[in-house]
Amino acid sequence: VPDLRIVDFGRVSALRSQTLWHALAYGVSAGAPPTLSFMRPARPYVGLGYHRRLEEADLAACREAGLPVYRRMVGGGVVYLDEHQQFFQIVLPVAAVPRSREAALRRLLEPAVAAFRAAGVPAELDGDNEIVVGEAKICGHGAAQIEDAVVVVGNLIERFDHVAAARVLALPDEVRAEVVRLMERFVAPTPVDPAAFRAAAIAAYGEALGLEPVPGRLSPLERERLDELDGRFRSPEWLRGPQRPAPKCSQVKVRAGVYVVWIEQDGRRAVATVIGDQIDRVEVSDPELDGALTAALAEARLVG
């Protein structure tokens, strides 16, 4: 039976909680075995998805709170990460996963669901590929292809500071208040034993992928890539990312299917909350913005 390399890095710096698994992806791309890794950041910080505008993070609030900001190579928005989150990453050669992104994501998240369940959390993978208990997301995940490797990252959230998570987003106050309200409903921590979760994840991924879990470590090539990644992730150019035009309307995703969308014109603002494909609530400071908000929602494809 081929190996599933298991690497548990334990507690690491905020920077390394990102660069280590990127290094593993380059290693697997170059021929290292499929790898399941674990780590926990030693301090809070903010992660930014690969394709997102840096302006989506409130950099002044991050500086004031002493939170570093790192751009990662998987998608998603601005996320608050801290020492109360157990990170896990599964990395496979691209040839070993289904071609369809949807199918690949389900295949690589289902063992995580099994691990949550084994640790005592009644988790399910819903139709939006969110790991949930009821309507609440319990695991933030992201996915990417890095060279010839596919990586899916996720977290076991033992405690979650919804207010701190909303504070790092660049939002008008009324939008921030709505995001906190939605996070409290739709993002839930699962305070279970992280060691039990890790053991269950190792067993579940080994079984699902037909691989034999074997303790491992970084290869020389991965150590080399790690040094390079540490430098890249610290560079202002990498953090700034590609220049993208500001969107006509702004939106924050709380979980799949739950968004706050808003537009601003000449100091006036219209805000809508979307749950499923229904508009849950709307606040418009000027009736003239109604049409613009409706058009923005249609354009964002959040409401049919």
Summary of predicted features, one role per range:
Residues 1-103:
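N-terminal lobe of the biotin/lipoate ligase/transferase fold
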Residues 37, 78, 122, 142, ...:
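Short, surface-exposed charged micro-motifs
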Residues 237-281:
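Internal helical hairpin/lid segments
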Residues 83-132:
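Contiguous, small/hydrophobic- and glycine-enriched helical/loop subdomains that border
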Residues 133-134, 265:
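Structural motif
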Residues 267-304:
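Active-site- and interface-proximal helix/loop "cap" or "latch" segments in soluble metabolic
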Residues 23, 31, 106-122, 137-139, ...:
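Long, positively charged amphipathic alpha-helical accessory segments at protein N-termini or as interdomain linkers
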